[in-house]
């Protein structure tokens, strides 16, 4: 299927596909078993590649091989058809490349290897040709691969092969390693060879982890232009590290470090053996933190903990908190190193012991506390205000909606109560884990209330399926009064539409839209660095509401869908799969959304149990002259 051939519920596709990825996993594995490439099992348990020493020539040749392997992987017709196990082919050619004593010899080896896979440059149909030229006019980001013409490095034979391959336009990738799905979404879940445990002494498997991840970023990461480091240099520098360190911990930590170079708070990392978790300590205090200008402040804790809300953490088991934050930055990807509450919360309060010595500052006094910690703790400690129920505020003059505690069907009941109030506070500072599907759609019905007309608020940029590595201007997202009915009027199947929204937004198999009134009071949206991903989308959708004001601090700066990646050794990580900007093209990734009015929570306020951001919101509604 061509990426641009079908558009279903386009305005919702980013969100819908985000829900679909998990459901697709088992079916993808079933399909994989039926592909020709799955029959090549020679290296299923071991690549047979071992490297004890690595010369500069070998490092350079492996660097070239990684790029050649990746460029071919996403373009060659036999590979995109699912007929060639390209991971296995990597293991077949690595030993030969390692034996080469010059770049010229390595280039000839790679050319001979690739010539086993001949191809013809395809001719597009009239429909495909028209579509291709339409796509070319929408280019947003272009991969740089002039290196395929560098004959001094590659040699004539290899350069000829790659240049010829660059003329191929990918028109069918349903069975490839990167499948283009509806909504221009790229799914790489089928690229999961050796997703189980590996022999960590196996150099080939370790290099596969590096090469796979590097090339996924090279060709399918829409924010490559926002990376600080030279991605090509990162590959070169990482080769000795992955080639020579032959144990589980060094491999997992090296891959974790690799993911930080994309600077993306969607870059979640998990290894089934909990290596990263163990690195910071197997035991965790049952407490949550909040970052206030670089200070780690306790924002919630279990009742029996000697920690108190408002404590400033100074050190844990003798290691300064600054050193621990530095270590987190080394292994955990964040869009902005100064906004890390979401990403680091799980790792900061860890210890190798059941009782951690945590130094804090409380009311200006330094204290040393013996804090109970729990092994592999799946803690659920709410931050100040996170579990606040939606309610009336300010003598029932203000309606307060906490997105984090909304349940299915709540919104319309609340808005019925809040009709006629002077103002509405929408709190988008906390994620709603239990009701994630509801949360992902909630901005649409809210928009029906607070936006008198439909407006676009978010522009998407997606991969060009014809030419891997190129990104194009894609669809936009809209919300506002009449938007849901507008989608039904476009002929979208009402049963399917209602099924998707059967979570309190639409509750009829006929697709009938709820009758929602126009809310005319002031609207204050609360935001901070914990406002991430779908919450950022929500805030963006409300920004142009006529009576809306966004207050708080900048958001996390990680927007777009999440693309899951599997790497050898039971490693799962992810990236943002679509680029997102404001409608005028202004950047949101890494820098976050900017509030209209900056309001910061203070350490003193947290210690006293005050929510200073809500206090300011109430003031803005009840005392308009203070705005």
Give the predicted meaning of each segment.
Residues 2-10:
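Bacterial N-terminal signal peptides that target proteins for export
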Residues 22-23:
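C-terminal motif of bacterial Sec signal peptides marking the signal peptidase cleavage site
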Residues 31-98:
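N-terminal mature-domain "stem" immediately C-terminal to a signal peptide or N-terminal signal-anchor/transmembrane
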Residues 43, 57, 73, 82, ...:
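Cleft-lining beta-strand/loop regions that shape enzyme active-site pockets
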Residues 57-58, 63-70, 137-179, 186, ...:
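PDZ/PDZ-like domain segments forming the peptide/carboxylate-binding groove
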Residues 64, 80-87, 91, 95-191, ...:
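Extended, small/polar residue-biased N-terminal targeting/export presequences
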Residues 68, 72-76, 213, 306-339, ...:
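Conserved PDZ fold ligand-binding element
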Residues 140-167, 302-303, 308-421, 592-601:
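C-terminal, low-ordered peptide segments at domain boundaries
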């Amino acid at each position: 299927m061509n990426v641009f051939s079908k558009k279903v519920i386009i305005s919702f596709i980013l969100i819908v596909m985000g829900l679909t990825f998990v459901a697709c996993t088992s079916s993808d594995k079933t399909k994989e078993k039926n592909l020709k490439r799955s029959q090549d099992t020679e290296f299923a348990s071991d690549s047979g590649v071992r490297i004890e020493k690595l010369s500069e020539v070998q490092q350079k040749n492996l660097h070239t091989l990684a790029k050649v392997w990746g460029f071919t992987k996403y373009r060659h017709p036999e590979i995109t058809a699912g007929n060639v196990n390209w991971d296995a082919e990597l293991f077949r050619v690595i030993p030969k490349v390692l034996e080469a004593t010059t770049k010229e010899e390595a280039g000839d080896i790679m050319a001979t290897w690739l010539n086993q896979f001949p191809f013809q440059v395809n001719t597009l149909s009239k429909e495909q040709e028209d579509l291709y030229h339409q796509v070319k006019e929408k280019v947003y980001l272009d991969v740089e691969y002039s290196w395929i013409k560098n004959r001094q490095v590659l040699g004539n034979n290899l350069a000829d092969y790659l240049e010829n391959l660059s003329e191929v336009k990918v028109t069918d990738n349903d069975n490839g390693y990167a499948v283009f799905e509806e909504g221009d979404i790229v799914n790489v879940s089928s690229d999961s060879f050796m997703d189980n445990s590996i022999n960590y002494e196996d150099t080939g498997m370790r290099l596969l982890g590096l090469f796979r991840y590097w090339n996924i970023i090279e060709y399918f990461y829409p924010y490559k232009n926002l990376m600080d480091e030279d991605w090509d240099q990162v590959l070169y520098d990482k080769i000795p590290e992955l080639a020579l360190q032959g144990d589980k911990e060094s491999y997992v930590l090296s891959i974790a470090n690799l993911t930080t170079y994309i600077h993306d708070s969607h870059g979640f990392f998990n290894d089934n053996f909990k290596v990263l978790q163990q690195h910071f300590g197997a035991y965790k205090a049952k407490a949550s933190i909040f970052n206030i200008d670089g200070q780690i402040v306790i924002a919630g804790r279990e009742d029996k903990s000697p920690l108190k809300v408002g404590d400033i953490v100074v050190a844990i088991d003798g290691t300064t908190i600054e050193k621990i934050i530095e270590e987190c930055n080394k292994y955990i990807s964040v869009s902005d190193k100064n906004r890390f509450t979401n990403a680091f919360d799980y790792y900061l309060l860890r210890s190798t012991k059941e009782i951690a010595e945590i130094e804090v500052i409380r009311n200006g006094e330094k204290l040393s506390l013996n804090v109970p910690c729990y092994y592999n703790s799946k803690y659920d400690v709410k931050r100040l205000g996170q579990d606040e129920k939606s309610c009336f505020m300010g003598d029932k003059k203000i309606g307060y909606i906490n997105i984090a505690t909304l349940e299915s069907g709540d919104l319309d009941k609340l808005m019925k109560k809040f009709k006629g109030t002077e103002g509405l506070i929408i709190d988008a500072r906390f994620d709603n884990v239990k009701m994630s599907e509801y949360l992902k759609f909630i901005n649409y019905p809210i928009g029906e209330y607070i936006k008198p007309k439909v407006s676009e608020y978010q522009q998407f940029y997606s991969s060009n399926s014809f030419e891997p590595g190129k990104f194009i201007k894609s669809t936009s997202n809209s919300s506002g009064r009449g938007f849901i009915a507008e989608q039904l009027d476009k002929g979208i199947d009402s049963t399917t539409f209602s099924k998707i929204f059967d979570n309190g937004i639409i509750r009829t198999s006929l697709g009938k839209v709820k009758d929602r009134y126009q809310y005319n009071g002031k609207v204050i949206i609360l935001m901070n660095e914990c406002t991430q991903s779908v919450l950022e989308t929500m805030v963006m959708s409300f920004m142009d509401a006529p009576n809306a004001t966004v207050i708080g601090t900048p958001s996390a700066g990680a927007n777009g869908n999440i693309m899951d990646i599997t790497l050898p050794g039971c490693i799962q990580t992810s990236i943002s799969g679509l680029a997102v900007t404001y409608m005028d093209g202004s950047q949101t990734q890494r820098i976050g959304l900017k509030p209209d009015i900056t309001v910061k929570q203070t350490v003193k306020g947290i210690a006293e149990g005050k929510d200073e951001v809500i206090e300011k919101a109430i003031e803005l509604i009840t005392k308009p002259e203070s705005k």
